[in-house]
Amino acid sequence: MKNMITELLSPAGSYESFEAAIGAGADAVYVGGPAFGARAYAQNFTQEELITAIETAHIHNRKLYLTVNTLLKNRELDDQLFEYLLPYYEAGLDAVIVQDLGVFSFIRRNFPDLDIHASTQMTVTGLEGMRFLEEKGATRVVPARELSLEEISAMHKASPLEIETFIHGALCYSYSGQCLMSSIFGGRSGNRGRCAQPCRLPYSVTMDHRKYKGDKDFCALSLKDICTLDILPNILEAGVMSLKIEGRMKQPAYTAGVTAVYRKYLDMYLSGKEYHVQEKDRKYLLELFSRGGSCKGYYDMYRGPEMMAFANEKKSGNIQPEIRKIKEKIHGNLILSPESPVILEITCKGQTVTAMGGEVQFAKNQPMEEQRIRQQMEKLGNTDFQWEDLNIEINGRIFVPVKVLNEVRRDALSQLREALIGCQKRAQVTKQPTKSKDQAACHRRVTDSLPVYVSCERSDTAEVLLNEPGITGFYFPFDTMEKYFSPELAASSELYLSTPHIHRGETPEKWLRSAQKWLEQGMKGFLVRNLESYAILKKMGYGEKCILDASMYTWNDQSVDFWREEGVLRNTVPLELNEGELKHRDNTSSELLLYGYIPLMLSAQCVRKNLFGCTGKYETAYLKDRYNSEFPVKCSCDPWGKNISEKAKYCYNIIYNSIPYGLPGEKDQVKKLNLHSLRLAFTIEEPEKAKAILKEFRTVYQENGKPSGRRYTKGHFKRGAE
């Protein structure tokens, strides 16, 4: 027998699925309520159903977690979140799953004894990000699904936080929380629980003028589902405490079937018996649901075509697993004496309750038989209880109306239910006041000219732009900074070193040494794209030299304040808020993107490797959709810089939008947002094109000229995300 604390965590998109999960052996269930969950199109729970589910879970010694794992707008957080959570908190909700750090800090302040689980949407990829969340009050982390067992084990050994990972179900092509594809394509934001799954659509792929020979239904980004039965012991031994099944959009039968199979094998492992997976169980899971087969996920491989379905063909069999309702055994003692009240005593799990009913009558004629009384008392219906034994003590010739027996039984069961859940309930709390803002600062008059910063991914583009007028500062990746940094340049322009979009593994020594040297010689700080990079820089004493990129979401003022208290220099305006929503946001420490190709996805998968083979070179592939729009896919083979890290170990793809984002015609509206600064981001542009675009925006924003008429998308600036 293995002495381990484990948890089998199942999904429920409806109350029926919740019952199916509990009945099949789940230790805990995660659900979405009427709002703020990352599966907005699941049936989800009403308030009454959710409170009942919390109570039912506690009766059976199970736990229930509520998803609040979306990004919230100011009015939602300020006006709705407290009242939304309060009844569930009072009912004894075990934890909330959270993505938004503004929501995180709000819950920590208003519900201090409510556990917070950091969602996989936070894109936690390493130990320092995990420690940062631990310091802020998280009790559990759901790291990025892309992490290997080796990475997870290292995190577990160095932090006391619980680790939860996915063991079965759908895989996103993008790092969770780093996907804007559905949002940009059709306004349905994955960060709001409304993903339309454009990664499951057909795309043709070209690279170096070569087209991959897939058919018209070839889905270049569609991953197989994950199934980890064969490596479950490895996952547990790496330090994963909670084994999470994906599938809140699935039917109760799926939840019951998958949960039951994993319960069987988790118990097998914990019992100390030889661990062996039966082929019939693998087939059973595929019959429940399959998307081109299954894979083991990223636990023991970094990427590869073996993980890809390359199709969106979903299959589910006609299997209907038994959905079992579990019952708690109760012990009862019924006392019936003439001219005395009916007395029913019930005991369950150390709790004893007593109910008294109407008066027992003396039977003048035919006395009531015990069998008839027992039949009536054993009618427990759809309750959470079943009789283990019921002693009936009859003193003399008695008669009791059936109505009286029913009433005393219902009263006793109601008392018992309340006794079992009462210890889990919490007292009411009052909403804590939000911090008063400096209204003069939030609504200061903005001058016509704001500082303009330029981000350059390509060294040749940076070379052309370095001597252009009107630029306050530059954001450079390592290779570009290494090539062009000088104390003289740092004296004339603010220089910031950009971190990789995804931070995994050890930060290369050369990167750290060079960054420290450049700081000593005048470099201002860092443009940070992820929590891990920030946490590492903060640990080194550089937290107050960090600028947050748009991928570090600050949708609401609570999140702005969270980072302001951290001391960061500024944040980047979120790309999914519209102009009207931005007017209700504190932008005084924010930088607005004026131009750039929006990253739609960051993926550990590689289009080039999967379809053409890996060359280890920075190259660009192109996806073409059914409307003939082409989306550049940049292969970031050396995220830290060339020759300073193990090549391709933690490389990634960035999929950009087909049309660049640009606001040359929105100068008057931009001026009303009370911003700190503006940014132009150059990624894949040729040097001369970048120079021409810079000139256009300089003409409009600094010289009061007219836009050139180039084609841009305004993204969400006008429409916003759902």
Regions found by a protein language model. Name each.
Residues 1-24, 28-40, 47, 51-55, ...:
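Surface-exposed amphipathic alpha-helical tracts and adjacent flexible/coil segments at the periphery
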Residues 122, 126:
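Conserved phosphate-binding/catalytic loop of the ribokinase/pfkB sugar-kinase fold
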